[in-house]
Swiss-Prot record:
Residues 285-316 have a biased composition (Basic and acidic residues). GO terms for cellular component: cytosol; nucleolus; nucleus; PML body. The lineage of its organism: Eukaryota, Metazoa, Chordata, Craniata, Vertebrata. It comes from Danio rerio (Zebrafish). Residues 96-180 form the KH-like domain. Residues 804-813 have a biased composition (Pro residues). Residues 17-37, 262-321, 388-424, 774-823 are annotated as: Disordered. The keyword RNA-binding applies. This is NEDD4-binding protein 1.
Length: 858
């Protein structure tokens, strides 16, 4: 290739044939087909984007499967120019289609033509964050637009105009499919569910369970998005490999056959394993350690193995196991298309759902009704419904049980195997209420079966485990408490002791998760030997062979309320405020004409935002709620004033995008502010409120009394007295009073009309007008009889706090006090000097400036 470059703004494409893709990796397709020709595209961008491109280089190469090289400046003659004017060379190398898409993405990244924000339900966040980011990468690749997850429920789309529109359309399509919850035709739905489940399990993360719960139509759309032309063969190979191994139920049955039905003394040789339909059965069976470390995330194999070991120790079931094994072998010899016999498959299904906490008779009935080939999720739904019906009929019997205070130390071992089986059935029914009410939640990443870590299957909220070391027929019951749903009404039935023997009954101490701040429901089983948390126990009452805590006695609630409250985080106003911010809010203003007779609304943005944020956080959502409230009332002349420095990023300012949205709608104005040597210089935003109210005759929405501006001018004084509208917030509800000027003033609808400006009505002063004759008569009597204490005028406008009546009047004002009051009143009311002199002479005892001002206004 030549080292020369074309002129700025031009590009040159050179096609080169290579034997393998960039990076030295060769896909399965390339190994079987003719290698594709690679394209080299070189173009220029502004130099000031170089840092951003260096950060995006790994992402571009990963998503678009190209080699991205930042060549830099080649023409150093223009090095004296600014970075905004100089340009650097970039090179993309790869397949022609990949290079074209990558170039569109880089161009949109450096010079975005369009930027948009798109909202989606929070429950869809797993699409953009799950599957190890594959869906998000494929969305970037298909649209060539930059898609950023700002927060759960909000995306930022930027890039070329066409790419942004395509990405927005794709996201809106996902949202529509999610909200419609539409299912696929019966012939396609099982196949789509199976493929999607395989796809998600191969890329399992903490969002896997949420992805599996998406609607079928959305699953099909996501599969189409994921099966891009980059790796079509790989996905097919993965699907074929999964289909050749087993389904979750048959895989579980194979594991049970290998671990339980065969003699533990006989080693498992590779020659025996390929017997099941010729399928590769060497997965997870090389050793016991490998089997422990490679458990599937969504199976209950550890607990299933415990149940199998429990059954294996019972001699009465030995011949049943062997006969089942023989039946299985016979079925395999006669029909290679079946992995296990129907009887074994039924037994495995029953055991599988029993480990999830459901009753055996309910599971057997549902499986026989629906058939063994039914989808696992549909079986689970039917089992949950049947369990709830059964529990509703047996609830009265469970709540009527009372514990027996007999100690466990003197328990005898006289119960037989049949009696133990019956007791196990009673225990499962007693725990079924807890188990059947649990919802399917996303699993934690800590794994399954680890006793000191959180369980990843919330449905299995209680596990019955046999004590191997004890000589009696006692069983340990481990109750896993979910503190989130633990209410006062549920404590007694959930902690009712289980009757294990005629003479021994126990109360079991639930140990819940100590991670109370985590929003996801967590359940833990805490080992007594490795944990020191929880209330102290009486060691003399604890069994030596028991690994978990038990408390003897009748009390159904071993832990006190104080211990529960000490674990929970304290409830504060800020915690509730932060919780309310998780609920998405969108500012929606209908594009329809309003009422022309309504006054201009002038909102004190700082006052409203701080009121919504509990006077600790500047909540921009409060401003948006206030604007929407007045918009719904028909106001179209709305102005919000906010200081300009509130545009800066600050942890105490929430949801600043509402400010930009209102500014774009010309409903918000920023008052000027600047910084000089680190000091902020801001104009008083209240002055802007008063100036605009004076110019437009509008109403100021604020809880500030604006007392500092009463003496500025007569017009401002009348605005402060007549046109202030107060408000309050009840969570996210903006409320204003129906009587903004008091109970004797005009109604809110009349107060907000433009016509009321000509003859303003001040309710407190109207009340005073009725009392004015008595006030003046009392003042006249006081001047005629100054020594009479009963005629001293102590009444005035009801909104002012006047001195309390006293047995003797205070002394009259001195001449200096009268002169000072006269000067202040002249400043406030410059056009009423004669009336000021008359009122001062009629009220020689009055020193309250506010009371004198009220008399002047009356």
């Amino acid at each position: 290739m030549s080292t020369t470059r074309p002129l700025l703004g031009m590009k040159r494409i050179t096609e080169v044939t290579c034997t393998e893709p960039p990076g030295g990796r060769q896909s399965p397709t390339a190994s079987r087909a003719q290698p594709d020709s690679l394209t080299v595209d070189e173009f220029t961008v502004h130099e000031d984007k170089q840092t951003e491109l260096k950060c995006s280089k790994p992402k571009v190469e990963q998503v678009f499967q190209v080699t991205f090289t930042i060549i830099g400046l080649l023409d150093h003659t223009g090095a004296h120019g600014s970075k905004a004017s100089r340009q650097i060379w970039l090179q993309l190398k790869g397949k022609k289609e990949d290079v074209y898409k990558a170039k569109e993405y880089v161009k949109g990244l450096c010079d975005p033509e369009l930027q948009k924000e798109e909202w989606y339900p929070v429950d869809m966040h797993c699409i953009f964050a799950g599957a190890r980011g594959l869906f998000l990468d494929r969305l970037l690749r298909d649209t060539s637009a930059e898609v950023q997850v700002l927060e759960p429920g909000r995306l930022k789309l930027s890039g070329c105009a066409e790419a942004v529109v395509m990405a927005q359309s794709r996201v809106q399509q996902f949202v529509a499919l999610f909200q419609e919850k539409r299912s696929l035709p019966a012939d396609r739905e099982p196949s789509v569910k199976r493929k999607f489940k395989t796809f998600v399990e191969d890329r399992a993360d903490k969002y896997a369970m949420e992805l599996l719960l998406l609607p079928s139509a959305l699953k099909e759309e996501l599969l189409g998005l994921a099966q891009s032309p980059t790796q079509p063969i790989v996905i097919i190979d993965l699907e074929q490999d999964r289909s050749q191994t087993s389904t979750p139920v048959t895989d579980l049955s194979n594991r049970i056959l290998d671990t339980t039905f065969e003699d533990k003394t006989s080693p498992i040789t590779p020659e025996v394993m390929p017997g099941l339909n010729g399928r590769p059965c060497n997965k997870r069976r090389s050793s016991e350690s490998e089997q422990r470390d490679t458990k599937r995330q969504y199976s209950l194999e550890r607990r299933e193995e415990e149940q199998c070991e429990e059954r294996e120790r019972e001699p009465t079931k030995t011949w049943t196991v062997k006969s089942a094994k023989g039946t299985l072998a016979a079925s395999e010899m006669t029909n290679e298309s079946e992995a296990v016999s129907p009887e074994t498959n039924l037994r495995c299904l029953v055991n599988f759902f029993r480990t999830m906490g459901y009753q055996q008779d309910v599971v057997e009935r549902v499986v026989r009704e629906t058939g063994q080939t039914e989808d696992t999720f549909l079986l689970l739904e039917r089992i949950v419904e049947e369990t709830q019906k059964t529990q509703s009929t047996q609830g009265a019997q469970r709540t009527s049980r009372t514990p027996d205070p007999s100690p466990c130390a003197n328990a005898s071992s006289t119960s037989t195997s049949n009696r133990l089986k019956e007791k196990e059935r009673v225990q499962m029914r007693a725990l079924a209420e807890i188990k059947c009410k649990e919802n399917i939640r996303p699993p934690s990443t800590n794994g399954i079966g680890q006793k000191n870590q959180t369980s990843s299957v919330p449905l299995a909220s209680a596990t019955l485990k046999r004590n191997n070391g004890a000589q009696t027929d006692l069983c340990e019951v481990i109750i896993i408490d979910d503190e989130e749903d633990f209410t006062e009404t549920e404590r007694k039935p959930r902690l009712t002791p289980l009757d294990l023997k005629p003479e021994s009954r126990f109360d079991y101490l639930p140990r819940g998760s100590s991670q109370t701040m985590v929003p996801v429901r967590m359940e833990t089983v805490t080992n007594l030997r490795s944990s020191s948390q929880g209330p102290p126990l009486r060691t003399s009452d604890t069994r030596p062979g028991c690994s978990y805590q038990t408390l003897p006695g009748r009390a159904p609630l071993p832990r006190s309320e104080a211990q529960y409250t000490s674990k929970a985080a304290p409830l504060t106003g800020m915690s509730r405020f932060q919780q309310s911010l998780r609920t998405p809010y969108r500012l929606i203003l209908q594009n329809e004409p309003g009422s022309p007779n309504l006054r201009h609304i002038i909102i004190d943005g700082s006052n409203v935002a701080m009121a919504h944020g509990l006077h600790r956080v500047f909540s921009c959502r409060g401003i948006a709620i206030a604007v929407e409230a007045f918009w719904r009332r028909g106001h179209r002349e709305i102005t919000v004033f906010v200081p300009q420095w509130r545009q800066k990023k600050d942890p105490n300012i929430t949801e600043q995008h509402f400010l930009n949205q209102l500014e774009n709608l010309r409903l918000l104005s920023f008052t000027p502010s600047r910084e000089v040597c680190g000091h902020r210089i801001s104009s008083h935003d209240d002055r802007f409120l008063l100036h605009l109210a004076e110019k437009t005759g509008g109403v100021i929405v604020t809880n500030d009394n604006l007392r500092d501006f009463v003496s500025q001018s007569e017009a401002w004084r009348r605005i402060i007295h007549e046109r202030l509208l107060q408000f309050t917030f009840v969570e996210d509800h903006f409320m204003i009073p129906d009587d903004p000027l008091g109970k004797h003033g005009p109604h809110l609808d009349e107060f907000l009309l433009k016509d009321s400006r000509g003859s303003p009505i001040i309710p407190p002063l109207r009340t005073d007008l009725r009392a004015t004759p008595s006030v003046y008569s009392q003042a006249a009597q006081s001047t005629a009889h100054p020594s009479s204490p009963s005629h001293w005028p102590h009444s005035g406008p009801p909104d002012w706090h006047l001195p309390r009546p006293s047995p003797s009047p205070p002394p009259q004002r001195s001449p200096s006090e009268t002169t000072e009051l006269k000067r202040k009143l002249y400043d406030i009311f410059p056009d009423q000097k004669q009336r000021i002199d008359r009122i001062l002479s009629d009220n020689p005892y009055m020193r309250d400036l506010n009371a004198l001002s009220g008399l002047l206004l009356g």
